[in-house]
Amino acid sequence: MWPNITAAPFLLTGFPGLEAAHHWISIPFFAVYVCILLGNGMLLYLIKHDHSLHEPMYYFLTMLAGTDLMVTLTTMPTVMGILWVNHREISSVGCFLQAYFIHSLSVVESGSLLAMAYDCFIAIRNPLRYASILTNTRVIALGVGVFLRGFVSILPVILRLFSFSYCKSHVITRAFCLHQEIMRLACADITFNRLYPVILISLTIFLDCLIILFSYILILNTVIGIASGEERAKALNTCISHISCVLIFYVTVMGLTFIYRFGKNVPEVVHIIMSYIYFLFPPLMNPVIYSIKTKQIQYGIIRLLSKHRFSS
C-alpha cells in the first residue's frame, strides 16, 4: 500500500553532547513522568468516583487530564529508553504513529481548553440556563467533536509521510518523533507538508486561543457589572484555574512555534529544551493548578483520603 516507505529505522537522540550525563538527566525526567501520571490519574479517578464532581466543568477537565496522560504516555517511553539504556532505534511506522498522536493530541488539548472556556462563559454570562444549555448530550457531542477534530485534521500530512522515501538521513534530533523533524529527512516534494500544518495550527490552536481571549473579555465585562464584591470574587474564582492552564499551554505553544519558524539562528539546544517544556510542563502543572485552586477538587481529595484511611 505504501511502496516508497523505507524499511530502515529512525534514530532518536536525547541531549546531543550530553550522552555521558543521560543517566543523571533521567532522574528529573522520571520524577516529572511519575508526577504527571499520578496527578492526572488522580484527577480521573476522583472525577469518576466522586458524584459531586459529575458536572460539565469536571467532564471537560477529564478530557484535559486524559489528553495530558496520552501525550505523556506517547512521548516519555522513547525519552526514558534513550536516557536509561540508550535505545535509539524506532521503526518508521512507530515513528510516524508517534508523531500522529503527539500532534493530534496537541489539537485535542487546545479543543479541551476551548470547551472549558465555553463552560466558564455559560456559567458566568448565563447561569440560569447553564443546566439546560450544557446537558449531558451536548457535553458528549462537544467531547466527540474535540477528539474528532484533533485526530482527523492531522491525518493528511501523516499519511504522506508513509509514501516518502528517506535518503538524506535517519537521525532525528529529539527523543521522540515530530512531523517537522521527519519531513526534513524526506527526499520528495514536501511543499504540502510545510504549508498544511501552518494552516491547520492557524485554524485550530491559534483560532481557539483568540476565541478563548474574546470569551474572557465578555466574561470580564459581566463580572465588572456584578455589584457585590463577594459575588465578583466568586465569579472570577470559577475560571481562575482555567485561565492559568490556558496561559501555560498557549504561551508554550507560541514560544515553540516562534522559535521553530523564526529561530534559525537559535542554538539547537534551545529548540530541544523548548520541545520538552511544551510536552511536559502543561501536563505536570494542570492537575497541580486544579488541586490548589478548585475547592471541589480539594474536598474530593480529602474525602478520598479519609475514605481509604477509615477503610484500612
From Swiss-Prot:
The chain crosses the membrane at residues 24-44, 53-73, 98-118, 138-158, 195-215, 236-256, 272-292. Disulfide bonds join C95-C187. Residues 45-52, 119-137, 216-235, 293-312 are cytoplasmic. CDD domains: 7tmA_OR51-like. It comes from the Eukaryota. Gene3D superfamilies: Rhodopsin 7-helix transmembrane proteins. The keyword Iron does not apply. It is a multi-pass membrane protein. GO terms for molecular function: G protein-coupled receptor activity; olfactory receptor activity. One of its GO terms (cellular component) is plasma membrane. PROSITE patterns: G_PROTEIN_RECEP_F1_2 (PS50262). It is found in: Cell membrane. Its main location: membrane. Keywords: Cell membrane, Disulfide bond, G-protein coupled receptor, Glycoprotein, Membrane, Olfaction, Receptor, Sensory transduction, Transducer, Transmembrane, Transmembrane helix, Ubl conjugation. Glycans are attached at N4. Ubiquitinated by the CRL2(FEM1A) and CRL2(FEM1C) complexes, which recognize the -Lys-Xaa-Xaa-Arg C-degron at the C-terminus, leading to its degradation. Residues 1-23, 74-97, 159-194, 257-271 are extracellular. Pfam families: 7tm_4. Odorant receptor. Belongs to the G-protein coupled receptor 1 family. This is Olfactory receptor 51B2. It comes from Homo sapiens (Human).
